Amino acid sequence: MKQLFRQWYDLSEIKKELTTRNWFPATSGNISIKVSHDPLTFLITASGKDKTKTTPDDFLLVNHQGIPVLETELRPSAETILHTHIYNNTNAGCVLHVHTTDNNVITNLYSDAVTLQNQEIIKALDIWEEGATINIPIIENDAHIPTLGEKFRKHIQGDSGAVLIRNHGITVWGRDSFDAKKRLEAYEFLFQFHIKLLSIQGGVSNGANSYS
């Protein structure tokens, strides 16, 4: 029970911080944190909640299938299946899914992936080579969540990572809440920088294909 309260507090603090950045517009987005490994349980945001508010009903505890562990009238976030795929296939401890203007714009500029390089902040992703290059996959959105989940699952590689969904934000996971938030901040910085650079240069660069 102590671990549950500790993780609840941790997730609540992340929600507050990301809310101040307006990364949960119009109740969008969902975040989760692992509570136990065996059996697998994790806290996830309840569906349809205004994340600018803090209430006792912000999160609910679910199992490895995304089913509530305790009796509740709350419904887990619609994209819970993305979180279950990550927790069931990695040792990740936290998953963050947010919608921002920048990450949505990026998915309209590129088709299957966006390539970013030569930025010091890439080191926040535990990539230490000078002039490092990263590729972030982009998948098509799908209103049928199980289908979206299968597309997403193919790109889960390791205990940390990120996947962009066309016009549907980014999902980032990490070893724990600190790692996941750090990675999310790094990706959003890179997107913002890249878009500003393109606006100055006047077009899509880095040899990637534009999407239309």
Curated annotation (Swiss-Prot):
GO molecular function: methylthioribulose 1-phosphate dehydratase activity; zinc ion binding
Cofactor note: Binds 1 zinc ion per subunit.
Pathway(s) it belongs to: Amino-acid biosynthesis; L-methionine biosynthesis via salvage pathway; L-methionine from S-methyl-5-thio-alpha-D-ribose 1-phosphate: step 2/6
Classification lineage: Bacteria, Bacillati, Bacillota, Bacilli, Bacillales
Record EC number: 4.2.1.109
Biological function: Catalyzes the dehydration of methylthioribulose-1-phosphate (MTRu-1-P) into 2,3-diketo-5-methylthiopentyl-1-phosphate (DK-MTP-1-P).
Record-linked NCBIfam families: PRK06754.1, salvage_mtnB
Organism: Bacillus mycoides (strain KBAB4)
InterPro entries: Aldolase_II/adducin_N, Aldolase_II/adducin_N_sf, MethylthioRu-1-P_deHdtase_MtnB
Enzyme class: lyase
Cofactor: Zn(2+)
Protein name, entry field: Methylthioribulose-1-phosphate dehydratase
